Amino acid sequence: MSQSRTLRQKSQKYQENIEKRGVASPKKKEDGLNINPYVLGFIIFVVVGSTLLQILKGQ
């Protein structure tokens, strides 16, 4: 008994879906820091500011 054309197409579509299931697309990892520029600026501000205060208090 041969399958009808629509039944073959549905079967093939189902098989393709089964083969794709669970396959995650690879994501490219971005190079560089994963930190917000504002947070980085704040950290630099605190470090430089505290260094300047220490220098001024020492005089």
Curated annotation (Swiss-Prot):
Region described as Disordered: spans on this chain: 1-30
Transmembrane segments: 35-55
GO cellular component terms given for this protein: endoplasmic reticulum; endoplasmic reticulum membrane
Keyword Transmembrane: yes
Alphabetic keyword roster: Endoplasmic reticulum, Membrane, Protein transport, Translocation, Transmembrane, Transmembrane helix, Transport
InterPro entries according to UniProt: ER_stress-assoc
Membrane topology (Cytoplasmic): 1-34
UniProt-annotated location(s): Membrane; Endoplasmic reticulum membrane
Highest rank taxon of the organism: Eukaryota
Gene Ontology biological process terms in this record: endoplasmic reticulum unfolded protein response; protein transport
Extracellular-side positions: 56-59
Biological role: May interact with target proteins during translocation into the lumen of the endoplasmic reticulum. May protect unfolded target proteins against degradation and facilitate correct glycosylation.
Protein family (similarity comment): Belongs to the RAMP4 family.
The protein's name: Probable stress-associated endoplasmic reticulum protein
Protein's gene: serp
